[in-house]
């Protein structure tokens, strides 16, 4: 049947049904929620049931467990996560029925088409920076739409359709999909060697992709670049777009001065381009989070948010799920009282930043880390760096690698990593074969007063929550 489009206001009515394959993923669920709010009939499928799928179902989405060709019948468009294989039965059925298939990033680009887009890219810090930017713009009365790769705790969601003209979203470089976006502002937090498997194991191709990302800006667009990162600083010198820099360097346009850590908070002086200085107390620990806050402050300043309002947003920021998420204290079966922090960090540079934040905030505590490596390829590519940074903690428990769909790689598993750490002579790692057994092993390692960091991008976060809810007994459901 040929459908008639009378005007742009009829788009939802003309093509109302959108189906998401892999709807439970952080990037997918956020887009699905925005489209639900726009009035689309949203359905989706996922192999797992999680907080995101339950929230979407409560909001009115039709969510199916598992993948089946029948799930896409009657839909007008299929949105697919990059984690989904081409032979997925829903994709095969959509092709046979000639239903349009949109990659996740392409649908995000469609949403951005109807707003003024701010895209936050970088190997590390995207989620926190995007969340802080959304908080600053919200505090400034701009009511932005946001799509974030983690749960913004104040909103209880990772996405919201705002009434304002700005949309702020993460731009995912991991698979090159950020090159589908056409924002008005582009942030680059840092550039590091990660996801090399998607770039032919060639770091130069990652560098080139970020350069191309800035080329997606219109001639009147703005690049917001962290010049404390050497790779980003090099890019700033050769990008043919307007550039505004941020960082702790003296030549940064937006910079932090007199930075000190006060427990779980950071205090600094925010210096803006016209010379205005404002004291800031950031409700997040670590110098890396100061840089994330500077990017958000630069965005706010560009859009006319007052310095005092920026500072208030940063001080009142409630945090993001699994980004140095202080879950509180719990008592082990041996009577030790420990503080548990859950964090998504899974790259050596992220681990180093989180360890520094933990030691800066709790210098008198022993730092105990439970780490679940993420992907065999990353463990192989960053093996020496992982061994170096993990050997700096007071006690370490390693679970087996979370494969994320990868086949095992010889010499890139947790036992090999433990041997490399042990050879450095600074710690004696404990290796747990199954992540479900982690909670029962930890009491043998923990002492009273310890700070326990639960880290990784896999399912270790469920173990952290299980420990808070049930103690160090049993296995996560």
Swiss-Prot record:
Pathway: Cell wall biogenesis; peptidoglycan biosynthesis
Source superkingdom: Bacteria
Keyword Electron transport: no
EC top class named in words: ligase
Subcellular location: Cytoplasm
Signal sequence segment: none
Gene Ontology CC entries for this record: cytoplasm
EC number: 6.3.2.8
Protein name listed in UniProt: UDP-N-acetylmuramate--L-alanine ligase
């Amino acid at each position: 049947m040929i459908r008639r489009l009378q005007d742009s206001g009829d788009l939802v009515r003309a093509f109302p049904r959108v189906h998401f394959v892999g709807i439970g993923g952080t990037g997918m669920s956020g887009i699905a929620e925005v489209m639900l709010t726009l009035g689309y009939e949203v359905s989706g499928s996922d192999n797992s049931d999680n907080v995101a799928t339950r929230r979407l179902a409560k909001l009115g989405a039709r969510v199916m467990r598992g993948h089946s060709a029948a799930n896409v019948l009657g839909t007008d468009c299929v949105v697919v996560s990059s984690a989904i294989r081409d032979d997925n039965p829903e994709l095969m059925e959509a092709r046979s029925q000639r239903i349009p298939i949109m990659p996740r990033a392409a649908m995000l680009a469609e949403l951005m088409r109807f707003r003024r887009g701010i895209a936050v890219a970088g190997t590390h810090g995207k989620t926190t920076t995007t969340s802080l930017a959304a908080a600053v713009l919200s505090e400034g009365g701009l009511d932005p739409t946001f799509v974030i790769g983690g749960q913004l705790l104040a909103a209880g969601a990772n996405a919201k359709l705002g009434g304002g003209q700005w949309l702020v979203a993460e731009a995912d470089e991991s698979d090159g999909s950020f090159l589908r976006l056409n924002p008005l502002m582009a942030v680059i937090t840092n550039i590091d060697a990660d996801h090399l498997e998607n770039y032919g194991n060639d770091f130069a191709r990652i560098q080139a992709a970020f350069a191309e990302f800035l080329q997606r800006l219109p001639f009147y667009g703005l690049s917001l670049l962290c010049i404390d990162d050497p790779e980003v600083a090099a890019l700033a010198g050769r990008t043919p777009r307007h550039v505004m820099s941020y960082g702790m360097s003296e030549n940064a346009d937006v910079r932090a001065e007199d930075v000190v850590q006060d427990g779980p908070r950071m205090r600094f002086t925010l210096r803006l381009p016209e010379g205005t200085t404002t004291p800031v107390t950031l409700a997040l620990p670590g110098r890396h989070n100061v840089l994330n806050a500077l990017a958000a402050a630069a965005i706010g300043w560009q859009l006319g948010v007052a310095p005092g309002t920026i500072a208030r947003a940063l001080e009142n920021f409630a945090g993001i799920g699994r980004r140095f998420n202080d879950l509180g204290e719990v008592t082990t079966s041996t009577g030790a009282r420990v503080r548990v922090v859950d964090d998504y960090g899974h790259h050596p540079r992220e681990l180093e930043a989180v360890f520094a934040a933990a030691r800066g905030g709790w210098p008198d505590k022993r730092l105990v880390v439970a780490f679940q490596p993420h992907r065999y390829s990353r463990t192989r590519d960053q093996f020496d760096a992982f061994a170096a940074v993990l050997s700096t903690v007071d006690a370490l428990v390693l679970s087996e690698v979370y494969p994320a769909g990868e086949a095992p790689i010889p010499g890139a598993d947790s036992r090999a990593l433990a041997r490399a750490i042990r050879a450095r002579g600074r710690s004696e790692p404990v290796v747990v074969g199954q992540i479900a057994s982690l909670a029962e092993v930890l009491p043998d390692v923990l002492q009273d007063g310890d700070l326990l960091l639960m880290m990784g991008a896999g399912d270790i976060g469920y173990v952290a929550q299980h420990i808070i809810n049930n103690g160090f007994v049993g296995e996560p459901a």
